[in-house]
Regions:
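S/T-rich, low-complexity, solvent-exposed segments of bacterial secretion/appendage proteins
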Residues: 1-628
Length: 628
């Protein structure tokens, strides 16, 4: 009889545990990180009823890992989409755009060309020029503000990561102290899920239930009960500052990140926002230099050579030296007017053993100079002239970085305050020919189209007019040579283009070595508006042929394209995440239909076990009555 009671009692206990397990599952159906519990039973020894083998968590490492990876990718895509959406909105279209301001300035110059003697239209030019400068400055402020916002968000994300890793380290301590617990493991799962959204991680799960958390680089965020802080010192120490630093590690882990909000924010800042800011600065420099060249090549109504229209974008700047430089040399960089400037930063490295410097363009990693540091400034490099104050002060391993256009869009201003300073008149170019005085007198005749609208001012040596001389090039051929040693082959009676001077001239008659041509220029007259007509033209800013409107359209297209790609990536990431969540739920999630069926099954089994107890009691009472 005791065997029957024992079997029934074990059945009651087992099915009561089943009811408790099902109730726990139902209660936590909406609890984040909860893994469904499942009761496992086994036959008691000797066939004396049933025992509870274990209450098992339905935890599947593969589906959890896939979910974590999907969360990291979605976190990165979501952060990138948010950032680039704000970036796209910074570039306005319509009448308030920079492109529209370019158009209105061109229209104002065209009005001056049509009415060169009317002062009012020249005043409009200055007003529209100030509008262009203001648009540049406004756009620069917006992009700078977004840069600052992203830096703060990166810092805040690093703080959230530190909070989560600290909690995981504390949880590891609890697991070591109290042993594995379903509630602690569920809490661990939730923290890992939250952390995966913020940063890409790798997990090393231990037998005692604790977990080590690593970055993709292998650097540990959590090791046992210790958590290491992640910091973001962006912008704190110039171009050589690390993007990320990890407590106790000399390596910058940012390059190894493959997902998470942290990676998405950093990628949006470094790969889209920073290049766009450089492109905007390049546009500001190119536009200002192009306008200034044309302005300086003309004459004002008073017959004075024109001055710069815009300022704030020219001049040499000093490169940043790496903190560990042991030498004391400084590197200066100056953009060349009208050169093909590239939107890129540069890094110069000195090899003391070979006594050479290597200049690398960081946008594509190309080496643009490698050689003697003393010859660095001999030639233009990407439209820039790099110069060391004293190459002897360099020390092995010294490095310099420089972003030649940085901040130009925010600094551009209108240099002119008086509309009478506008160089609306063309240059009337003149020339005089001096016989070389050789044994055979020459009879050289020169003709010039006059007046001319020059794209750039005539080059001069000091205050002297430029002089060109006919020389023998060494092979018996006469060529025209300028003061810088540039030589131009000519044919008598045919037009000769002197590109550096913006001129075309024709030589005829008899030429002899030693003949000299002295160029001069003066205003074409107060009623002339030819130079204003040139200033109104939509001309190429750089050697690639792009105009100001083209460059702005390219900026707008880049921002819009990046934002669109980020939006599509977020949508795709959401689908992948949803699929990973469904797979995880299929393994570890609570299905209420299944739980309802299990609840009914355990309830019926419990009632049947109770009935067995009742039957056993009836039999026992019958036996007692017989005995009595």
């Amino acid at each position: 009889m005791s065997g029957l009671f024992g079997i029934a009692a074990s059945a009651l206990r087992a099915n009561q545990q089943g009811l408790s397990t099902v109730s726990q599952n139902i209660a936590n159906v909406n609890t984040e990180g909860y893994a469904r519990q499942q009761l496992e039973l086994r036959t008691s020894f000797g066939g004396a009823g049933v025992d509870v083998a274990q209450v098992r968590r339905n935890f599947d490492a593969w589906s959890e890992s896939a979910l974590g990876e999907a969360q990291s990718q979605f976190g990165a895509a979501s952060a990138r989409n948010e950032a680039l959406g704000r970036l796209e909105s910074s570039f306005s279209v319509g009448q308030g755009s920079l492109s529209a301001a370019f158009g209105r300035l061109q229209d104002a110059f065209a009005a001056v060309a049509s009415a060169p003697t009317v002062r009012g239209v020249r005043t409009t030019v200055l007003e529209e020029a100030r509008t262009v400068a203001a648009r540049f400055q406004s756009l620069d402020r917006q992009l700078s503000s977004l840069d600052s916002q992203l830096s703060k968000e990166i810092g805040a994300t690093a703080e959230r990561i530190n909070t989560l890793t600290a909690q995981l380290a504390e949880l590891n301590q609890s697991l070591r102290s109290s042993g594995e617990s379903s509630s602690l493991l569920d809490q661990q799962n939730r923290l890992i899920s939250d952390l995966s959204l913020e940063v890409s991680i790798r997990l090393n799960r231990q037998e005692d239930g604790t977990v080590d958390v690593l970055l993709p680089s292998g650097q540990a965020l959590v090791r046992g009960t210790e958590a290491r802080k992640l910091e973001s010192p962006l912008g704190a120490a110039g171009p050589f500052a690390p993007q990320l630093s990890l407590e106790g590690s000399p390596r910058d882990p940012s390059g190894s990140l493959t997902g998470g909000r942290l990676q998405g924010l950093m990628e949006a800042r470094a790969e889209t926002l920073a290049p766009l800011r450089r492109d905007l600065d390049r546009l500001a420099v190119g536009f200002a230099q192009s306008m200034n060249q044309a302005q300086e090549a003309g004459f004002t109504a008073a017959g004075v050579a024109g001055g710069a229209l815009f300022s704030g974008v020219d001049g040499a700047a000093q490169a940043s030296a790496a903190p560990r430089n042991s030498g004391s040399a400084t590197l200066s960089v100056a953009p060349e007017a009208g050169a093909a400037l590239l939107a890129s930063a540069y890094e110069l490295t000195f090899d003391g053993g070979a006594n050479t410097v290597t200049l690398k363009r960081l946008s594509d990693g190309a080496e643009v100079y490698a050689g003697d540091p003393a010859n660095l400034g001999a030639d233009l490099i990407d439209g820039l002239r790099f110069s060391l104050d004293d190459a002897a002060l360099l020390s092995g391993g010294d490095r310099f970085r420089f972003d030649p256009l940085a901040g130009a869009a925010g600094r551009i201003t209108v240099a002119l305050s008086d509309p009478e300073g506008l160089a609306k008149n063309r240059a009337a170019v003149g020339a005089s020919v001096t016989d070389g005085g050789g044994a055979t007198p020459s009879d050289l005749v020169l003709s010039l189209p006059s007046p001319q609208a020059l794209a750039a001012p005539l080059p001069r040596t000091g205050t002297n007019a430029p002089v060109l001389e006919i020389v023998d090039d060494g092979s018996g051929t006469l060529v025209l040579e300028d003061e810088d040693g540039g030589q131009y082959a000519f044919t008598l009676g045919k037009p000769l283009s002197l590109e550096p001077y913006g001129l075309e001239l024709t030589l005829s008659g008899t030429a002899a070595a030693g003949d000299r041509i002295t160029l001069s220029f003066a205003s074409a007259g107060p009623a002339d508006g030819g130079q204003a007509h040139l200033l109104a033209a939509d001309r190429a800013l750089f050697s690639d042929g792009a105009t100001a409107v083209d460059e702005y359209a390219s900026l707008l297209g880049t921002a819009a394209g990046a934002a669109n790609r980020a939006s599509l990536a977020q949508e795709a990431g959401a689908l992948v995440l949803s699929d990973a969540q469904l797979r995880r739920e299929a393994k570890a999630g609570v299905n209420l239909d299944e739980e309802a069926a299990d609840l009914l099954r355990y309830q019926q089994a419990y009632q049947a076990a109770a009935r067995v107890v009742s039957v056993a009691d009836t039999i026992f009472q019958s036996v007692l009555s017989v005995v009595r």
